[in-house]
Amino acid sequence: MFRRFLAVFLTLGVILFAGWMTLRRDDIPYEQLEAIYANTDSRYLAFGDNMRVHFRDVGPRDAEAIILVHGFSASLHTWEPWVDNLKRDYRVISIDLPGHGLSRCIDNAQIGPAQFIETINRVANTLEIERFTLAGNSMGGAAAWNYALAFPQRLDGLVLVDAAGWPRTETESEDRPLVFRLLEVDLARRVMKDLDLSSLIRGGLEDSFGNPGFVTDEMVERYASLARAPCHREALLELVSGQGETRREATPELLSGITAPTLVMHGERDNLIPYQHGEQFAAAIPGAQLILYPGVGHLPQEEIAELSAGDLRAFLTTRVYGVREEALQAIAPE
């Protein structure tokens, strides 16, 4: 009996190991990824601890500047529709945050908002941009409102697109896509870290759009490949597990300190961050403008690119740069 049990146990072990080896995927060198996902607008900024940030800088150099930061596991590619819309009239800088896209990781440092804020500052300083409008989606939205509190003197405007930051209720946590719930389990993270997660990535992306048909094979391949850049899987797991840098949660008292003109955008069919969180941001930030998009998911900048970019343009014209120009004219000597 014992021998039979041992034989079954060993057979199952061999099958599981063979399956793990079949699904296991090695890192993809940055040089190989850059050949596919960089373009002629790509730039790189190196600083201490082996950090190398990938960003793109397009549009007139003397135009008002907009800096765009993406969400968890995404890359600057999420902003391409907005960049195409805005680059004629604005200087548009999109950034791959540390541990994402084509950016490296900072050695021996916890990944999180402080790193992201430092990265935004370093890129802006390198480009000699003193003031700008900062837009962030999801995790990038959390980085954006934290930046607005840390460096209010640098912001002309703030744009929060399905931004993260408010504490989740138990129901909201249970309703999130499967891939995010799995990644919160320590054993699942250890098993999944080196595996091909394309099917889970596809499911997560389909949950991110109001229309799941928006997800393409090319999009899934990009997310899966960039996650396999050296150090990226470790960084992503560190972020989702909460083992990275401590993140502060949004509160009405905290957000009341934001002084930049603010636009809050949120898809009403966002399965990752409920639209009620967008309403909370708009209620807490003084003078914030709220736009909700019925039927739209977590990524309005992609799903309804033309409409959301048009709303951004209107905000910049009426609430940010148009207002500033009127103020400058009012104080100009005759």
Task: Enumerate the predicted regions with their spans.
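Conserved HGGG/HGGXW glycine-rich cap/lid loop of the alpha/beta-hydrolase fold
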Residues: 58-102
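Catalytic active-site module of serine/aspartate enzymes centered on a nucleophile-bearing elbow/loop
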Residues: 287-334
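Conserved hydrolase catalytic core segment
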Residues: 130-172
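Alpha/beta-hydrolase fold catalytic core
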Residues: 1-64, 89-90, 130, 316-334
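Short beta-strand/loop motif that positions the catalytic acidic residue
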Residues: 258, 264-266
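Active-site loop/oxyanion-hole signature of alpha/beta-hydrolase fold enzymes
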Residues: 48-49, 56-58, 94-139, 310
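Acidic catalytic loop of the alpha/beta-hydrolase fold
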Residues: 269-273
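Conserved alpha/beta-hydrolase catalytic His-Asp/Glu region
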Residues: 25, 32-33, 171-173, 192-254
